[in-house]
C-alpha cells in the first residue's frame, strides 16, 4: 500500500511543475519534520494545503483525533454518503450486487452488475460499518455476508475467482490501475480515509490479487498475508470480507468501504503496532515476493481476507482507508545529505513509504495504527518485500544528480506535467504523499491522467514503448480486448477511449502484476481480467451514465491507456466533477455513478471506472499506480519503513510519519524502472516517485521527452477534457476545498500521511471522496454537501463553464500546476503553453518562491473554508445558518426612525385608470398600437378628424395638413418594420435551433454579413405575408396593426421614429433651416460639378484636345470653391432641432453624414486618422444603398453606432442610430455596409413595404381627406426622389454617389481625453473638400472659436406650435390630449422639443394620464365658453357637421396630467384631486399642511416658482380673460423661451403699478381712466410674459374647475363692463363712505399682495440655490449672453456648505413661501368679506379686484408660458441693457434685482421725462447722469414709456 501511495504520489507530481514540486517538497522536508508529527503535512504536500486542510491546530492527543474521527467519520461518512449519495447509493446496490457479482464474477457483465451491487452493498456495509464499532467482525460479517459470499465463491474457485478477479481487476487495473490505484488510494484516504483506504487498499489488494490473482500473491507472499491475518485476528474475516470486499469493490463496494474503513487507534497502540508492523512488513513483503503464483493466489485470498479485515477495521472507520502501522525510526533509514534537500525529502518520503509496507499497514490496521494507508500501499508493500538497502538501488546519487539536471532543464515541462521530468524520486515522494493521502492518490491519478492525456495521443505507443515489449504486448492485448469492450460499450467512441485508457491501464496493471508476479500467466490473466474489466467498465459506464460516465470512462480510459496519454489531471478531475455534478445535479440514473463520481472525484479514473465499478475503478487506478509502483517495489524488493518523527510542531499534529521505501535487488529495480518509466509517462504522477527512485537517468530523460510530448497533448486535451468532463464552473481550488470539506466530514478519523506536496493538492482537486487531514483528525469542516460546489444545484447554463473550471483546477494543486490550472481557466491552451515555457527558465529559487506563494494561498483558502463559499450561481441552502440569521437584537439597529413623508398611499385610494402604469407585453387585446398601454383602441377616421379639428382650433395657424399625414405614415411604417423584425426574429429563431453555437457567435459579432441577403430575402417574403395579413386585419377590424407583437417591444425612440425626413417637416426656425438647406444644396451642386469634371478629366486625358476647356472649367470651379465656405456653425438651445435639421437636409439632398459626437473618443489624433482620408474627397460609398446612411465615428466600436447597441429583444430600433448589421435597425433595408453607418434617416421600407403602407393608409379610416391622401402620395414621391425611399434595386443616378458631410456635435463640450479636438476641427476646416457642420448650444462659442465659418442661429420655436405637434404625435398613437398639458410641459422644458417628445413617449408608454370625459373643445378662446366662442368666431360649415357628429360619435377620453406627472405631483396628490382647488381651499388639517409643504418643496427643487407664477389662479380674487388680440398669432413669431424664461416680469411690479393708477385715479379722472385701461393691458401683457426663472407645471383638471368658477365672476364683472366701472371711477376721488370702504378693500388686498411679494423677493435674495453656488451655468448669464465655458467650473468647490443642502434650502424656502402665501390669502379672504357691504352701499369694487389674464396665459396651467410677442424681446433687451451697466452688473440675485429695481427705475425715468418736457428751454441733467448710472439713453426712454 505504501508503494501504491508512493505511486500515487509519483503520479501526482507530474502535473506539478518541476520548479513548483521542488519547493513543495523542500517545504515538505521542512514541513516533514513537523509533518512527521503532523499528519497534516502528509495530507497536504504543501504547507498551504496542510493549513487549508486543518487550519486550526488539533488537540495533541491522538486519541482525541481518532475518537472524534470515528464518530466524525461516521458522520462524515453519512454526510459523505449524502453528498456522494447518488454515487454511494449505487455502491450500496453494488454491495448487494457484490454478492451477485461473485456469481457474475465469472461473467464480465455480472462483474459490472456486481460492481454496482457491490457499491450499493458496500454502501450498506458502509452504513453498517459506520454504525458498527471498531470491531471489524461485525462489519466484516456484514460485508462478509455480501462480500464473503462473493469471496466464498471466489475462494471456492480461487483460481477461477482469481482469474475472474484478475480479469476484473486487470480490466479495472487497466481502466483504473493507473488512475484507480491513485483513486483508490485517494479515495480511501480522501473519501473515506479509514474505510476508503482499507477499502481501496483492500480493493487494490483484491483487485491486484484478482487481476493478477498472483499480483497480490506475488507481491504479498502467503507469509505476509498470513502475517496480516495473524496481525489481524479478523484477518480471515477480513480475507473473506476482503474477498467479498474486493468483489464489492469491483462491484463498487469501494464506496461502502470508503465510508466505513476508518479505525480509531490509540497512540500507544499505534506506536506498538508500528514497531510490529515494521518488523512484519519487511518479512511479509519478502515472503510475498517469494510466494509462488498459486501461493499468491492463496495469499491473495488471505490477502484479500487480511485486506478485508483491514478494510473492515477501516470499514468501521472506512472501507477504503487502511490504517498502517508505521515503523518509528529516529532517522529515516536512507538519507543522503549530499543530495539536494528536495530530493532528500522525496527520497525520505519514499524511504518512509517503503519502510511502512502494506503488510505493516495491514498489521497496523490490526493494531489500529494511527496512520492510514490505502490498499495499494499495502499491496505494494506486500508485493515487494525488500531490505532497506533497496532504497539506494532505487535512486543513486548519480541518478539524483541526473534527475536534478533533468529537473532543472525541463522546467517548463515539469511545470506542465507537474515535475514529471523532475526526479523520479520527487514523483515517488509526491506519489507517496498522494498515496498516503487519499487525496494525494486522487491527485496522483489526476496527475497520471493529465500526463496520460498529454501523452494520450502519443501515449499508447509511448506507454508501450516505455513499459517495454511486454507492456506493448499487454497493451495490444488490452487494445484488442478494449476494442471488443469498446464495441460492447454503449457509446463506441467513448468506450473506445475508455477501453484505450483501460488498455493502457491494464497494461500498466499487467506490468505491475508482472513486476509483482513476474509470471506471464498472471500477466495473461491480468490481461484477461483487464479486458473483462474494460468490457465491464465500458458496459458499466454505459449502464450508469452512458454520456457522463462513458465520457469519464473514456477520459479515464484514455488516462489509463496512456498514463502518458491519459486525460490530464484536469480531465480526470473534470470527469470526476462532471460525474459528481451530473450525479448530484442531474441525479444520474445510477446512484452508483454518483457515488462513483464521488470516488472519481477522489480518483478521476475511478470515476471513469465508476461506470464499471467504483471499487474496480479505484482498484484499477490504484492498481495502476500502485501496481506499477508495487511492481517497481516488488522488483526492487523495496519495503516502506514508516518512521515516526517526533519533532514538535505547533501547527501540525503530534504524530508525523515518514515512509522510506526500501528498494530490493537491481533486477527488480530495473523492471520497476521500466515500469515506472512507462507508468511515469502514463501515470504521470502516480508511478513517478517509484520510477524516480528506480529509474535511471536514461529513464528520466525518456520520461522527460514523453512528458514534453504529453504536455503538448495534455494542454490540448486538458482543455477539451475540461470542457467535456467538468460540468461545474469552479476553480480547482474551489472544487478541492469543498471536496476536502466533504472528505473531512465523511472521514474525520482517518489520518493520512502525506509526504508529497503536490499530492495533496491533486487530492484536493480529486478530493470529493478523499479524506483530508481534518477528516482524519476528526476536524469536521462545516460544509455540507449542499455547500460543496460539485454538489451545488447549478443552472444548466453554467454547467459547461463550471466543468471547464473544475477541469482546470485539477493540476493546480501542484504548486506550479496549480497556478497553471488556475490560469487555464482564464487563458487558452496557448497561454498555458507560453506560461509553462516561460516558467521553464526560472531558477529553482524563484520556482520555490512561487510554490510557497501558492502554498500560502492554499492555506488561506483552507482557513476560509469555514465560511460559506461564494458561488455565483447558488441556490439557497436551508442547511446553512447564514440563510437563517436572526435580526439584530440591538434596538438601535432594529428601530429606525420612520421617515414621515406625508405622501398619500395611493394604493389605498381608488385607483384611477392610468394612475398605476403597468407595462404588460402580453395583453389580451391586440387592437391598439399601444397594446400594452391599457389597450387603447385605434381611433376611427371620424374620431381622428374630430380631434384634428380640436387641435386646429386650439392653434388655427398651425398647418396640421403638413405634419399629421407624415406622422401617421411614420407610425404605420414603424408598425410594418416591427412586424418585419418580428418575422426576422422568428426566422432567426428557427435558424438558431439548427445552428445554436454558430448563432451565438454570430449574435456576439452582430450577425455575419454573409447571412444577411438570405435573411433579408426570407424576411421580405415573411414581411410581405405579414403585411398582407396586416392589411387584411385592418380591413376587417379597422385597426392599423395588431400590436400584440409590437407591444412592449418598441425600442425605437420617438425622436427617431418621428424624425423629420425633409426640411419642411421641421418646426420653427424656417429661415435658419432654409439657409442651411441652400448651403448644403450649393455644396451638392459643387460636388456634382466636381464629379462631372473628374469624369471629363478622365476622358480628356484620353483626348487631350479638350484640355483647354478643362482648365477653364477647373478655374471656374476653383473660384466657386473659394467663394463657398466649407464650415457652418449652428448655435441654438438644446432640443430645438439643430441636428435634426442637418439630417433632414442631408437626407433630402443625398449627403452621407459622418457624425462625431460627444460619446465618441474625439482626440485630435484619432479624428484625423479616422476621417482625414474621407475629408479629401466629396464622394463616399459610390454604390447607393448605403450612400446616405450616416456614419458614426466611434474610436471604441467602429462597427457600431455609439448611440445605441442592438438589444437582444424583439425591438424596432432607430433607423439612424443603430448599427446596420442589426436586423432590427435595418428593417426593410438591405445588406448594410460593414462601416459604422447607421441609417439615421427614416428609410421607407422598400417598394413592397411602400405598397403595404399605402394599403394601410388607404384602409386607414382615420385618413379620408383627399388632401391628406394626396399628401401621403406626394410624400412618397418626394421621398423617392430624395432617396428617402431606398429601393433595394438601384437609386436614382444622382443618389448613387453620396456626398460626404462631417458633423461635429456639441463642439463646445470637450473632455480631458479630447485633446486636440478643436485643433483637429480647424485642420478639417482648412483642408477638407467636403462640408463641415458644427453644432453647439453655447451662444458664445462663435466668439472664442477661430476660423472661417458661417453661423446659423436656431431659436426656440413657437411654444403653441410645438404643443400642437406633440398633440398630433399623441393622436397618431391613439391618445387624446389637452393642449394645456403640453404648453405647461414645454414651458417647464424651455421648449426643448427632443426632451418633450422623449418624455411624452415615456408618459404614453407608461399608460398615459388620468382619463377625463371632456367635450370637444372647438374654440379659440377659453374652454369655459366653448360653444359661445365657437359661435362667435363663426365655425365653418365644415365644423358644424362635425359638431353634430361629435354628439353621435363616442369621443375618447382625454389623457390629462402630463405636466403633473413630470413634476411628480401625482405622488403628492391623487389624480382625482385638484391642485388649484386644494390651494384655494383653506388649509386646516395637519396632513393638508404637510402636503402643501411637500408640494412647494418639490417645485423649489425643480426651480419652479409655482405660487408666484399662479397667483392669479390661486388667490381668492376674481380672474378675467382678455379677449384675443391681434398678437394671438404668436405662433408665427418665434421667441427664445429660455430667454423669455429668464426675463423676470414680476407680479410685484404689476401690483405696484396697479396700485399707482388706483391712487392716480383719485386725482385725475381722464388720466385715471386711461391708466386703469392701460392697467388691464399692463396686467395682460405682464401675464402674457412668463417669468422666465419660473418653469411651472400645470394641473389641468383643477385649473379648469377654478377657471370656470372665476370665469363666472369675470363674466359678471365684464357684463358690468369696464366702461361703466371706469365712468364710476372717473368722478372725483371717493368722498362717500362707500367709496372709502371700497378703496380700503382694494388697498388692503394690494398691501397683502405686496407683503407676499416682498417676502418672496427676500427669500430669493437670501436663500439662493445651493446647487448654483458652486457652478456657473448659462442660466446665470443667458440674459447677458454670457457664459462660463464648459470645464472651467466643473471641479467641485472646496467651499463647504456647512451641511446646507439643496433639499434643506428648498424646504426652508417652501415653508416660508407657504406661510407667507397663507397669510396673504387669508388676509385677502378676510378683506373680501366686506365686499358685500360695499355692494350694499352702492359701489362694486369687483372690477378693481379682478385679475385680467390673456388667453395664452390661461392656457398654461401653473407656469407662465414663454410669450411669443415682440414685447417680450423688448423687455428682455431692456433688462439686459440695464443690468449690464457697470453699476448694476454685480447686483447679486438677478431675479430679485429685477423685481426690486425695475419698477423704481421706470418710475424715475417717467418722472425725469416729464421734467425734461417741462424744461424745454434749458439744458436738462438727468438724474441717472447725476448719480453716474450709465444706462443708455435709448434704454432710459424705453423705461420711461409704459411697459412695452
From Swiss-Prot:
Keywords: ATP-binding, DNA damage, Isopeptide bond, Nucleotide-binding, Nucleus, Phosphoprotein, Ubl conjugation. Residues 1630-1719 are annotated as: Interaction with RAD51 and RFC5. GO terms for cellular component: Elg1 RFC-like complex; nucleus. GO terms for biological process: cell population proliferation; intrinsic apoptotic signaling pathway in response to DNA damage by p53 class mediator; isotype switching; negative regulation of intrinsic apoptotic signaling pathway in response to DNA damage by p53 class mediator; nuclear DNA replication; positive regulation of B cell proliferation; positive regulation of cell cycle G2/M phase transition; positive regulation of DNA replication. ATP binds at residues 1132-1139. Its main location: nucleus. There is a cross-link at residue 127 (Glycyl lysine isopeptide (Lys-Gly) (interchain with G-Cter in SUMO2)). The keyword Cytoplasm does not apply. Disulfide bonds: none annotated. Changing residue 1432 to K: Abolishes RB1 binding. Expression detected after methyl methane-sulfonate (MMS) treatment. No effect on the RAD9A interaction after MMS exposure. Resists to DNA damage after MMS exposure. Changing residue 1169 to A: No effect on the RAD9A interaction after MMS exposure. Resists to DNA damage after MMS exposure. ATR may stimulate the RAD9A dissociation. It is found in: Nucleus. It holds the Pfam family AAA. A motif (LXCXE motif) lies at residues 1428-1432. The modification Phosphoserine is found at residues 44, 219, 306, 311, 354, 369, 602, 614, 621, 817, 1116. Signal peptide: none annotated. Residues 368-384 are annotated as: Interaction with WDR48. Residues 178-204, 477-499, 580-623, 658-700, 987-1047, 1092-1118, 1203-1235, 1272-1292, 1591-1635 are annotated as: Disordered. SMART domains: AAA. Residues 664-673 have a biased composition (Basic residues). Residues 987-1032, 1092-1106, 1602-1624 have a biased composition (Basic and acidic residues). Has an important role in DNA replication and in maintaining genome integrity during replication stress. Involved in a RAD9A-related damage checkpoint, a pathway that is important in determining whether DNA damage is compatible with cell survival or whether it requires cell elimination by apoptosis. Modulates the RAD9A interaction with BCL2 and thereby induces DNA damage-induced apoptosis. Promotes PCNA deubiquitination by recruiting the ubiquitin-specific protease 1 (USP1) and WDR48 thereby down-regulating the error-prone damage bypass pathway. This is ATPase family AAA domain-containing protein 5.
